[in-house]
């Protein structure tokens, strides 16, 4: 179910403060965050945000098409693995 339009989008306060300070100074730095649930807002466009995937921080460059999505959508947590091969030669 989608979030109510009466409410504002969730953005972690510390991340939003860092982005606003960088926008005022006109700087571009990598912002490290563990907040995967934060919604991407227009103030983030053009910044690189390193999102934690459970093991490491993955740098993500924010574009205008990402606005409205969550940061966690762009940092996959699972590695797709296939099934083990049932090769009879490897058993011998």
Swiss-Prot record:
The Gene Ontology biological process terms listed for this entry are: ribosomal small subunit assembly; translation
Q: Which keywords does this chain's UniProt record carry?
A: Chloroplast, Plastid, Ribonucleoprotein, Ribosomal protein, RNA-binding, rRNA-binding
The subcellular localization recorded is: Plastid, Chloroplast
Q: Does the keyword Plastid apply?
A: yes
GO MF assignments: rRNA binding; structural constituent of ribosome
Q: Name one GO cellular component term.
A: mitochondrial small ribosomal subunit
Main subcellular localization, coarse class? plastid
Which PROSITE patterns does the record match to this protein? RIBOSOMAL_S19
The answer to whether UniProt assigns keyword RNA-binding to this entry is yes
Which PANTHER family did the record assign?
Answer: RIBOSOMAL PROTEIN S19P FAMILY MEMBER, SMALL RIBOSOMAL SUBUNIT PROTEIN US19M
What family does the database annotate?
A: Belongs to the universal ribosomal protein uS19 family.
Q: What does this protein do?
A: Protein S19 forms a complex with S13 that binds strongly to the 16S ribosomal RNA.
- What this protein is called in its record is Small ribosomal subunit protein uS19c
Q: Which gene encodes it?
A: rps19
């Amino acid at each position: 179910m989608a979030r109510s339009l009466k409410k504002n989008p969730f953005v972690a306060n510390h991340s939003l403060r860092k982005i606003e300070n960088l926008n005022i100074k006109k700087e571009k730095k990598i912002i490290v965050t563990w907040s995967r649930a934060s919604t991407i807002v227009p103030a983030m466009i053009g910044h690189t945000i390193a999102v934690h995937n459970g093991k490491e921080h993955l740098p993500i460059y924010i574009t205008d098409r990402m606005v409205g999505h969550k940061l966690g959508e762009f940092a996959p947590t699972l590695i797709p693995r296939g099934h083990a091969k049932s090769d009879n030669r490897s058993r011998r």
